[in-house]
């Protein structure tokens, strides 16, 4: 969503999946991450950042209900075990930017925005409360065409869920809709 700050005029529609909610502790996290980067090193793994952020969990069951997809993730040699300090800093910086309303130019207020999330993805989306906050923030920025859909019995990676055909059908319908 930070891309919208200066580039919403460059896109016709915006699709969000597994829509991330704003973390109220992001400003504090940024200060801690800055401290860790300076004193431990950007490429190191700070245990306190890992603990506070939750980034680097080995349990991947929050991703999807599809056990085959989780097995693929667990067997993928390219999956990182956790984020280094600069990685956590980047995530918290992006999260912090979600609420910096004054930085959004909102040059395309009629931009159609569709958010597709799993109802069981409370950790990332913040659940109904987090999604409502996201919608209200987008509206405060100036966007008028925001549709938030939660799919029951789905987790974070709705594109990799067991019933993902429902997601793909909704995506196709969104992009085929006329303005």
What are these regions (language model features)?
Residues 27, 125-128, 160-163:
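Short, solvent-exposed loop/turn segments at secondary-structure boundaries
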Residues 2-83:
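Alpha/beta-hydrolase-fold enzymes
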Residues 8-9, 104-109, 141-143:
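Short, conserved loop/helix-junction motifs that constitute active-site signature segments
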Residues 130-137, 167:
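A general structural detector for well-ordered alpha-helical segments in enzyme core domains, enriched
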Residues 84-105:
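Active-site nucleophile elbow and catalytic-triad environment of alpha/beta-hydrolase enzymes
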Residues 115-117:
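Short beta-strand/loop motif that positions the catalytic acidic residue
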Residues 111, 120-133:
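Conserved alpha/beta-hydrolase "acid-adjacent" motif
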Residues 139-179:
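Catalytic active-site module of serine/aspartate enzymes centered on a nucleophile-bearing elbow/loop
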